[in-house]
Structures are given as C-alpha cells and as structure tokens.
UniProtKB/Swiss-Prot annotation:
Its main location: cytoplasm. Its cofactor is [4Fe-4S] cluster. Pathway: Protein modification; protein lipoylation via endogenous pathway; protein N(6)-(lipoyl)lysine from octanoyl-[acyl-carrier-protein]: step 2/2. This is Lipoyl synthase.
C-alpha cells in the first residue's frame, strides 16, 4: 500500500494528501482474484507514456492510480486531466493530490490537441481536477480544449468528464455550448455516503447538473458513474439509478472502489462479478441506453468502443419508436 507522500512525481517532496495525514490508518482488505491486473510493461504503454510526457500533460490514469492503465496505454488510449494535477476538493476516495492549484497553463489546449492527433485517437476523454478557485470553475478552459481538439483532429469524438461546477453560474452552459459528444459527470457514490465520501459535493446538485445538460442540448449523450464497495446498500444503488433516469442520463458505469492508501476511505466490501452483472441487468431494465458494470469498470475504460455502442443503441431506439 502506498504512503501519503506523492508517489506519482518521484521528485516531489510535498505531502500528496495533507488533509488526510492526521487520520489513523484504515484496514486494508486483501483483493480477490478477480481484481488482479498485470503490471504495465508493453511497448504501446511506453510509447503512450512518452507522448504524454513530451507534451507535458497530466493523465487521470496516473494521478488516480487506475488499475487499467496498462491495458489502455498499450492501445494508446489515455484520459487527459486538464487544469493541473492539484485539486481543490478532498474526497475520501480519490488519489488525486489536494492543495492550492497553480495557474492555468494557457498552452495546454494546444498541447492536448497535438497529443490527440499524434496518438491517432478516434475518441478522447478529457477530465479535470476541481478548480473551485476559478471564477468559472474552469469552464472556459474546457471550452478551449474542445475547440483545439476539433481544429487539430476533426474526426475525433470528444467525451468530457467534468467537476460539478458548484456555485459557478453559467459554467455548465458554456461547456455544453462547446458541443462535446458525451457529457460525463460522475455521481461517485450513493446519496447516503456523500457526507463521508464526497463531502465537498451535493448529491442533488449533481443530479440536476446532468438533467440540465439534457435541457440545454437534448441530443447530447450524458453519462455518469459510481463506485461500489463503500458500504452502500443495494436499494441505495437502485434509487441512484432511478434518480439518474429521472435526469434522462443515457449511460451508467459501475465499478469496484479500490483504496489508494491507508489514509483513504476503507473498502467495505468487494462486490462479486455476479452482483455487478445483476446491477447491469437492472439498469438496462430502467431504460439506460448503455451500462458498463464490472469490478474493473472505470468511467473512461473502453470509452471509444462504448461510445460506438451507445450511439448504435440510440439509433436502434429511434428506429423502434418510428415504427
């Protein structure tokens, strides 16, 4: 298990999670066999890493310690994390560093666009840290990144995974107006866990955010994801599904929570593959166009393939409705 120190940047001396340093170590459960993944060693992984470093980019794959980094980077898939690597929030589950962020890098939109073109991406996912310090929460920067990618690689479809833009009037409208192909905002966990797991956020604000996207652009695909294994009850997960469907969300992802350090929220349970399959079945019955539910599912895992299936599912639904 990694320590509280920054383990992403080998030269860093700062504490990665200062707000968690005073906490007692939590119990660490042994991972079941279905969670284990191979260490990244492939040529494709090395090439992707080189491109990321060349353009001085940050990826959520590294910062969040994603277990799928070896598989995704081998295929030259990466999720770019814009607006720096320091977040203004301190969620109990997240491995991204907390603190006072640096000023925005004005060259970042062009650098991201160059990397997308160089990697030949047909679909790209752009996420960010929370930037509560910015007047618009980073909405203009998202807009610039989307525009830069459109200019450099017009055929690439763009998926964004945004923060909640809490108390940032007009921010959401600006991002939606930039016309990403998929708007993703993760609920992360059930309503009853928000005070302990996601204390800086508001459950119904996030639901309303996703609903508002559809009001602004009914044709835009919306997506959200949660982690399980944080002590939630099954009925709470089903209620969250209902809340997302009320907001007309198209795509739901469900994955196992994995504890980054002993200072983070403990894993309360490892949900079995059969339970994930059951959640998938129920979610489809509630009307989601696309559901990805498995222990290693993450928001941007297989995002390009999933987008193709999502688009096909909508076309099929429209054809059926027209008959």
């Amino acid at each position: 298990m990694v320590t509280i120190l920054d383990t992403i940047n080998p030269d860093a001396k700062r504490v990665r999670h200062p707000e968690k340093a005073h906490r007692p170590d939590t119990e660490v459960m042994r991972k079941p066999d279905w969670i284990r993944v191979k260490a990244p060693t492939s040529k494709g992984y090395a090439e992707t890493r080189a491109i990321v470093k060349e353009h001085k980019l940050v990826t959520v794959c590294e910062e969040a310690g994603c277990p799928n980094i070896g598989e995704c980077w081998d295929k030259k898939h990466a999720t770019f994390m814009i607006m720096g690597e320091i977040c203004t929030r301190a969620c109990a589950f997240c491995n991204v560093a907390t603190g006072k962020p640096n000023a925005l890098d004005m060259a970042e939109p062009e650098n991201v666009a160059k990397a997308v073109k160089e990697m030949g991406l047909s679909h790209v996912v752009i996420t960010s840290v929370d930037r509560d310090d910015l007047e618009d929460g980073g909405a203009e920067h998202f807009e610039k990144v989307i525009w830069a990618i459109r200019a450099a690689s017009p055929a690439t479809t763009i998926e964004i995974l945004t923060p909640d833009f809490l108390k940032k009037p007009g921010a959401l409208e600006r991002v939606v107006a930039a016309k990403p192909d998929v708007f993703n905002h993760n609920m992360e966990t059930v309503a009853g866990n928000y005070l302990t797991v996601r204390p800086g956020a508001r459950y119904f604000h996030s639901i309303r955010l996703l609903q508002r996207v559809k009001e602004l652009d009914p044709t835009m695909f919306t997506k959200s994801g949660i982690m399980v294994g944080l002590g939630e009850e099954r009925n709470e997960v089903l209620q969250l599904m209902d809340d997302l469907r009320t907001a007309d969300v198209d795509f739901l992802t469900i994955g196992q929570y994995l504890q980054p350090t002993r200072k983070h929220h403990k894993v309360e349970s490892f949900v079995t593959p059969d339970e994930f399959k059951s959640y998938e079945t129920v979610a489809y019955s509630k009307g989601f166009l696309m559901v990805a539910s498995s222990p290693l599912t993450r928001s941007s895992h297989h995002a390009g393939d999933d987008f193709a299936r999502l688009r096909a599912a909508r076309e099929k639904k429209l054809l059926v409705a027209a008959e």
